[in-house]
Every structure is written in structure tokens, then in C-alpha cells.
Amino acid sequence: SCPAPATTFIGSIPSSSHSCGLSRFLINYYIPLFFVVSGYIYKEGRSYKENIEHKAKRLLIPYFGYSAVLLAVYVLMGRTLAETKASAFGILYSRYCLYDTTVVKDNVYLFTVANGAMWYLTAFFAASLVYHLVIDRCLSDRKFLIGTLIVLTAITMALADIPVLLPWSIDLACVGTIFMIAGTLLGRAQFFEKKWNIPLIAAVFVIYILTSCLDPGINMSIREYGIYGAFSVPFFIIVGLTGSLLCIWFGKLIENTAPGRFIAYVGKNTIFLLAFHIFALEVVERIASKFIAIPVPGGAVVPFVLYHALRITAAVLGCLAFSEILNRLKKRLRRKTR
């Protein structure tokens, strides 16, 4: 069975744990994991048009729908017309900020309605446009596969240092395609269905730690592949692939346990969580601030870590509860329309 449901949410935890100092090794695989898992479960037989229509329905309808909900909430909270226009432009441009953060200090931040995590949905769609163009040929022609991977890497490196972050993460589409192709190749080889190979897992773990140390500062959302600019791209690909392998292995390890089943349930609500977890974290923080002094970085470690762990837990559970209510309402509406 595919380990995707058990692993996608594991990958989403580090972004919220960033302030707790856990992100150096955890966050590097966060976004690549989603691409790898998507490629892993790829099914042949659909036309290019069918694949893209499916992706548009799965990704773009939630993106614009949930973005509109968040925009409306912030308008009701008192956003000015100018702020609302800027937020609407950010939704259309779909990027965390406008410029490369290593080049421009006074950046233009575009996701201003707690929708920062939703850049992935349009990034994934952009990568899918490339992936579905080449994947079937890649599976049938090894020379074409190798050539495609080389060209995709070269394009990614060429776009790595341009000053502007392109809309819909077009500049990440090629590297996203590399991760998706890797996932598809793993799926065709039934890589995760094989018996546990402890020496291989240990080797992958060592490679992941070493490359993470050699090339720190990875943040795919703002096109930061590490500290070496364009030359960080190969390191980033290795980090993303090895980190994804480790995460999926972990998902396989726990998939038949109670925590594994819970994570599988969470995985089914990944898009809803991506859309609303930042807003939920803000709500929890506002409520908590009325009752306690919020622990700050540099203070006592235990209260700081405990607070953020509880804050993340409350936000996730709140999102899951709301998602469950919406799903039940949808089911009732479907029954009535039959």
C-alpha cells in the first residue's frame, strides 16, 4: 500500500516547529516530500488534458476558494481597501514575497491573510504542467529520462539567482518535476514494498545529515536552495530525496499503529490544513495571550517548547474538527441533491 497518507502530514509539522529550533534538519524535506509522494502514486492511462484538469480541480479550486474565505475574514476584521487590494494581488501572484530575499532587504510580502502555506498548491500545479508533459516518455525511454533530468536541473540552476520570485512558483516547476519523477520511479520499482534494508536506511540517513550540514539555509518557498546559490541545487535535490525517503520509511514503520492511523487521517485533510493552519495558530495565540504571558525566544526553554507544542496541537485539532464538520455538511447536501 502507498505510504502517502501517513507521510504528508509528517512533512507539514516542521514549518510550525520552526520557532522551536527543530527546523535545521526537519524542514529540508518538507516540500520535496509532497512532490515525491505525488509522483509515487502516479497512474498511467490519462491524457495530458485529463491529468491537468484533475490537478486544477484538486489544487486550484481549494486555493482560490480558501483564499477568498481568508480574505473575507480579514476584511471583516478591519482591513482597509488598500490592504485588501494588496492581499488580492498576493493571492493572484501566489508567492510569499516578490523578490529574492538574498538580494533585496526591503521586500514586498504578498501573503498577508494567513495564507502563506498555500503557495504550494499553485507551485504543485505549475510543476504538474511540466511533469505530465514528460513522465510517460521518461518511463519508456531511459535516455530521454536522463536527458530530461539534466535539462530540468540546468533550468533550475539558471533560474536560481534571478532577482524576482516568479508567480505561481514557475521557477520551482522544474525541480518539483524532478522530485515527482523520482517518486514515480520509486513507485514503479515498488521501493517501499520491499523488505527493510537497514544498511541502506542508515546510509540514506548519513547522506541526509551530511548534505544538510554542507548546504544549510534551505527554504524552497522562497527559492533558497542553500548557501551556494545555483550550485546548491544538486545538494538540495539530494537533501529533498533522502529526507523524503526517511520520512516515508518512518510512515511505513508506524502505519499500522494508533499514531499511524491518526496521521493517515490527518493526511486526508492536508489541503485544508495547509490553507488554515496559520490562521488557526494566530487565533490560538490571541486567545492564549489573554490568559498567559507568551514565552519568547531566548527565555526558559521548557515553557517555550511546551507552549508551541500545545499551540500547534490546538491549531491542528481545531482545523481537523472544522474540516470534519464541513465534510459532514457536504455529505448531507449530496444526499439531498440525489
Each predicted region: which residue ranges?
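Alpha-helical transmembrane segments and their immediate juxtamembrane cytosolic regions
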Residues: 1-338
